[in-house]
Regions:
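Flexible glycine/serine/alanine-rich "lid" or loop that lines and gates the nucleotide-sugar donor pocket
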Residues: 260-261, 281-283
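Pol beta-like nucleotidyltransferase catalytic core
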Residues: 200-202, 282-363
Length: 363
């Protein structure tokens, strides 16, 4: 008997992503789904909030293949949604107010909860309760629970669902712009090569919690400071600080060059616990320096002294001073560990796939 092969065409899944307004996480998720071949409809609850606040993200989403933005309109919703991603923040009350309309059409729901470690534990649990109450009977369709800023060991959602962090990627400009993407992801650095910059900070001083960390270390980067860690290593220190009100960052190509020339990159938290900087540093072989309680947020298996330096109990000054005492063989060892992470963790296709798996789209 002749055995004929049968070609089964996979049905395109119907994915909708609810947000109050688009932000960097919206792009991270939509782009990861797009490169995985999925069509994504981003249902924006309050489109007027996007004017000026996330214009760049909004534009990048519109230019991303297989992604479309839909202003809140129940008439635009399909009769059935295969996968609904509910991104509760950055404005939880507004997002939840309009979540029932798509939720009652959804076969499966991925909830990205705002009840994470950015809030005190009691407030996080209260927020999770509000989310479940807002979804009502449709909450039983939640099969994936994610957090941007990590989760507590015990919380309400963890009582009945497995929990994961979403993970993060480089800033959208390094994903969306083809030239910058290739520059950021190029494996053109040698783990064994001595670098000319010991440490850098590149970014905004805002918000206040980041400014407090920077106030503790700023003088260590000053070229006339006798306490500068660079004196012990004969390497320079690079500092480029600005405010949100006057956001004058480095040219993206210069930014990549500084990371590529730096042994260490300071990654203090900003408005969220997660920032793009640790991933950007890893991609250029620069060892991230970040808070000890943020190592589990990125989905890249950070380990202190192996592929990063952790800051304990907000002791940023002591940590930066200690960088000058890290010997060159130790720096090369950590950089070699980072290089070994590339294929399965850091390369964009691998990172995007892991995000899709956590969302529930790929196995």
């Amino acid at each position: 008997m002749e055995n004929r092969g049968v070609v089964v065409r996979r049905r395109t899944m119907n994915v909708w992503h609810l947000v109050c307004r688009t932000d960097s996480l919206t792009y991270t998720i939509a782009k990861a789904l797009s490169v995985g071949g999925h069509d994504v409809s981003v249902w924006v609850v309050n489109p007027s909030l996007d004017h000026g606040l996330s214009e760049g993200i909004h534009t990048s989403l519109r230019e991303t293949p297989r992604v479309r933005i839909v202003a809140r309109d129940e008439m635009a919703l399909p009769p059935a949604i295969d996968r609904l991603v509910i991104q509760v923040f950055p404005r939880p009350q507004e997002a939840l107010l309009h979540a029932k309309a798509p939720a009652r059409r959804a076969q499966r729901i991925t909830l990205i909860s705002a009840g994470d470690r950015s809030r005190p534990w009691r407030d996080a649990v209260k927020q999770q309760l509000r989310e479940l109450r807002s979804l009502g009977i449709h909450a039983n369709r939640i099969d994936h629970v994610l957090y941007k800023d990590g989760f507590y060991r015990r919380d309400l959602l963890g009582m009945f669902k497995a929990r994961h962090c979403v993970g993060f990627d480089p800033h959208s400009q390094f994903i969306h712009n083809a030239e910058l993407f290739h520059a950021m992801y190029a494996r053109d650095w040698d783990p064994d090569a001595r670098r000319t910059i010991l440490a850098n900070f590149l970014g905004s001083r805002d918000p206040e919690i980041r400014k407090r960390a920077l106030d503790n270390v700023r003088l260590l980067f000053h070229p006339t400071s006798g306490s500068s860690a660079s004196l012990a290593t004969h390497k320079s220190m690079r500092w480029h600080e600005y405010s949100d009100a006057a956001a004058i960052g480095l040219d993206p190509r210069e930014f990549i060059r500084v990371l590529s020339d730096s042994d260490f990159t300071l990654c203090p938290r900003g408005y969220s616990l997660v920032t793009h900087r640790p991933i950007e540093a890893l991609l250029r072989g620069s060892i991230p320096v970040l808070s000890e309680d943020e190592l589990d947020l990125y989905g890249v298996d950070f380990k202190d002294g192996q592929n990063c330096i952790s800051v304990r109990e907000a002791r940023w000054r002591e940590t930066v001073e200690s960088l000058a005492r890290v010997e060159e063989p130790e720096i090369r060892r950590m950089r070699t560990n980072i290089d070994a992470m590339f294929d399965e963790i850091l390369d964009y296709p691998a990172m995007a796939k892991q995000i899709r798996v956590r969302i529930g789209m790929d196995s």
